[in-house]
Regions:
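A conserved acidic beta->alpha catalytic loop
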Residues: 28, 40-52, 63, 87
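Short aromatic/hydrophobic "clamp" motif used to bind/position activated sugar donors
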Residues: 83
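N-proximal low-complexity "stem/linker" segments adjacent to membrane-targeting elements
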Residues: 1-28
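Acidic helix N-cap motif at the loop->helix transition within catalytic regions
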Residues: 20-23, 45-54, 95
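Conserved donor nucleotide-binding strand/loop of the catalytic core
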Residues: 34, 48-73, 77
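Short beta-strand/loop segment that forms part of the nucleotide-sugar
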Residues: 13, 34-42, 59, 88
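Catalytic-site signature of metal-activated, phosphate-bearing donor transferases
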Residues: 8, 68-76, 92-221, 225, ...
Length: 347
């Protein structure tokens, strides 16, 4: 399939009560597409009016309890040769000019890089802040591709998936937005689980939902079961492992987390995120086992964060957090060295 002036490229959104962010999203993508298609599922704020003011073709539908159904209805309405799928709390940071160029050639699915920002403190002993997590998500679809799944829906297609040099920002994980969405997806996830009880991706998403509500013990159960059946080549296995290790630590199971990290180390030799979390786990152990802190745990923390700096940033890794291969690791090392120095002087 080639793309030319007669080929339509549409930005396709499903929305509900997104007045806070809809204009920003549509204004960022408008210059790069032929059509803005918005399907509203029951907004009670000014979302519809703002979308129309931004030039969108707005349609309305009742919410039927499935994100896949809504996505597919929006794709039917768009009727475009290529579809860029966006959420209202996202906006293009860079690469908009690459969209149309990428669509030249044979049909395939495009994965774009989504930078999700957080306010949350990742409550490890190092008080780790997660400012930006990177995810490569399939969002650019040729005509005919449709979604499956009530929640955390996925496009289903035998076509190959390739990365597009398109970068989105996403602020839907900021605390103020998460509080509004608390528990919104849980019921849908549980329904999906009854139909697909062994699906590792559903288990992973349930764990993330529980982690977001600080239910760390429950999250560990779902992460553990997800990890058992997640293939080594699954692109989201990296993020799954990091979330699982973090929740084990928060559940007071740092020793168990370190054993798991040891078993998984060969799979992620070049992940700064993996070694950053290992450093945090070692610091947790130093606090819970002070007798061996100087001899064992603090040196392990230091060498782990040094490894992060040696690897550098890896934005190509699913679930990678910006800074773990640079300033966040350096900060932890600086704090550790200053505190260790004080401890040695006092001895």
């Amino acid at each position: 399939m080639s793309i030319n002036k007669a080929t339509q490229l549409a930005a396709v959104l499903i929305v509900r009560d997104e007045a806070r962010s809809i204009s920003r999203c549509l204004q960022s993508v408008g210059p790069w597409v032929d059509r803005l298609l918005v399907l509203d599922t029951g907004s009670t704020d000014t979302t519809v009016e703002l979308a129309r003011a931004a030039g969108a073709d707005v349609h309305k539908t009742a919410w039927l309890g499935s994100f896949a159904l809504a996505r597919n209805q929006a794709l039917d309405l768009a009727n475009a040769d290529w579809n860029l799928i966006l959420d209202a709390d996202e906006w293009i940071e860079s690469g908009g000019e690459q969209i149309r160029l990428w669509c030249v050639g044979s049909p395939r699915l495009g994965k774009v890089c989504v930078h999700s920002s957080y306010d949350r403190v990742g409550a490890s002993a190092a008080n780790e802040i997660m400012p930006t997590e990177l995810s490569w998500i399939t969002r650019l679809l040729p005509r005919g591709v449709r979604y499956e799944g009530r929640v955390h829906e996925q496009p289903v297609s035998p076509l190959p998936r390739e990365r597009v040099p398109l970068y989105l920002n996403h602020d839907g994980y900021r605390d103020a937005q998460l509080n509004k969405k608390q528990g919104r997806n849980r019921e849908l996830l549980l329904l999906e689980l009854t139909e697909r009880p062994s699906d590792p991706y559903i288990l992973y998403q349930l764990g993330k939902d529980e982690e977001g509500r600080s239910e760390f013990a429950a999250a560990c159960v779902h992460y553990q079961n997800a990890l058992k059946t997640t293939g080594r080549n699954a692109n989201w296995r990296h993020g799954l492992l990091l979330h699982y290790l973090h929740c084990l630590s928060r559940a007071g199971r740092s020793g168990e987390a370190l054993k798991l990290a040891g078993a998984e180390m060969e799979a992620f030799p070049d992940s700064p995120d993996f070694y950053f979390v290992v450093g945090n786990l070692a610091l947790d152990q130093a606090i819970s086992d002070p007798e061996h802190a100087i001899s064992d745990w603090l040196p392990l923390a230091a060498v782990s964060w040094e490894r992060c700096l040696a690897i550098g940033e890896r934005p190509d890794l699913e679930g990678s957090v910006h800074g773990r291969g640079s300033h966040l690791a350096q900060h932890n090392l600086d704090v550790l060295r200053s505190q260790t120095g004080l401890a040695l002087v006092r001895k």
